[in-house]
Amino acid sequence: MKLRDSLAENNSIRLQAEANTWQEAVKIGVDLLVAADVVEPRYYQAILDGVEQFGPYFVIAPGLVMPHGRPEEGVKKTGFSLVTLKKPLEFNHEDNDPVDILITMAAVDANTHQEVGIMQIVNLFEDEANFDRLRACRTAQEVLDLIDRTNAAA
């Protein structure tokens, strides 16, 4: 499942969302996947449990997090949600706080997680200007167009 296709088919883009805590921000992303029948509601708690156990493991770049759990923690099918925050939040990461872009990922197996999910996110943000381009998006279509332009250039 490609990032762009998942976001479009699952209607799982939320821009300029408001959240007061990192937990609320993560819940917005997971709730989009629950609504699209990609994950079970328990996926949210699994992500929180992972942070409790391993720390903020999904803070992957300045301003960017990729919340995700394990396939057996409620994943029904592979999918993504994308959330931008109106106000950046602290995720307790020494180097990459504050965060205002969340790409929540659900993968049916570890191979999909590594090869499909992470590589597509890396591709999108290989051009660092895409961080600001994404922050400037105000409609889901603008996000999809940005991903299309990035994929065309790759």
Swiss-Prot record:
Protein purpose: The phosphoenolpyruvate-dependent sugar phosphotransferase system (sugar PTS), a major carbohydrate active transport system, catalyzes the phosphorylation of incoming sugar substrates concomitantly with their translocation across the cell membrane. The enzyme II UlaABC PTS system is involved in ascorbate transport.
Record localization: Cytoplasm
GO process annotations (BP): phosphoenolpyruvate-dependent sugar phosphotransferase system
NCBIfam families: PRK10372.1
Domain of life: Bacteria
Name this polypeptide is given: Ascorbate-specific PTS system EIIA component
Keywords: Cytoplasm, Kinase, Phosphoprotein, Phosphotransferase system, Transferase, Transport
Residues bearing the modification Phosphohistidine: 68
Source species of the chain: Salmonella typhi
Keyword Transport: yes
Residue intervals of the PTS EIIA type-2 domain: 6-150
Statement: the UniProt record of this protein carries the keyword Transport: yes
